[in-house]
Regions:
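Fold-independent oxyanion-binding glycine-rich loops
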Residues: 1, 17-18, 69-70, 100-102
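Conserved metal-phosphate-binding beta-hairpin within the catalytic cores
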Residues: 1-24
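A glycine-rich phosphate-binding loop feature that marks nucleotide/adenosyl-phosphate handling sites
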Residues: 1-6, 56-67, 150-156
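Conserved active-site and cofactor/substrate-binding residues in soluble primary-metabolism enzymes
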Residues: 13, 25-29, 33-41, 61, ...
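Structured core elements
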Residues: 14-15, 65-67, 118
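Active-site "cap" helix and flanking loop/linker of ATP-utilizing ligase/carboxylase catalytic domains
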Residues: 19-92
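Generic long, charged, amphipathic alpha-helical segments
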Residues: 79-118
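Generic C-terminus detector
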Residues: 103-106, 111-158
């Protein structure tokens, strides 16, 4: 699982949380690689016989997820800031914008959380997937958003 540890110079580390599940970005790069019928997998899990099912994955597809966050996240950040030009991303093949912290207000898409958009790109290489994801990020017009620039950087040669 994932654990979040807070380290303060004047005290010992404190365990803040321990997650035994994947978060959104992790899930959003695993699910598209599943080639098995997802409904069959869910039904097998419900019936308690998932151990009898072989899950088929596309091992060749490489995926990268870049999370667009509201400036100030994870501390304080503004809600209600408009996000524009999302439709332009549709021109990039094999890229999806997954809304995580958005709302639809007065006919506009606005930020409604800290982690706002997940940009998922797939390609034959991590370098190509990474380039597509950041190309999409650069098309999105959101003054109050930011991304980390190091996502999948170390995986570019794979």
């Amino acid at each position: 699982g994932n654990k979040t540890v807070k380290q303060e110079s004047y005290s010992k580390p404190k365990l803040l949380e321990f997650n035994v599940r994947f978060g959104d970005p992790e899930t959003q790069i695993i699910l598209p690689r599943i080639e098995s019928d997802f409904v069959d997998l869910i039904e097998s899990a419900i019936d308690g016989n998932l151990n009898q099912v072989k899950v088929e994955f596309n091992k060749d597809k490489k995926l990268v997820c870049v999370v667009m966050c509201a400036k100030g996240y994870p501390e304080s950040y503004k809600k209600g800031t408009e996000i524009k030009n999302l439709e332009a991303v549709k021109k990039i093949p094999d890229v999806n914008v997954i809304h995580a912290g958005t709302a639809f207000k007065n006919g506009k898409i606005v930020a409604n959380g800290g982690r706002v958009l997940n940009i998922v790109a797939s390609a034959d290489s991590f370098k190509e997937a990474r380039n597509k994801a950041y190309e999409a990020v650069n098309l999105i017009d959101w003054e109050d958003g930011f991304v980390r620039l190091d996502i999948a950087k170390k995986a570019e040669n794979f």
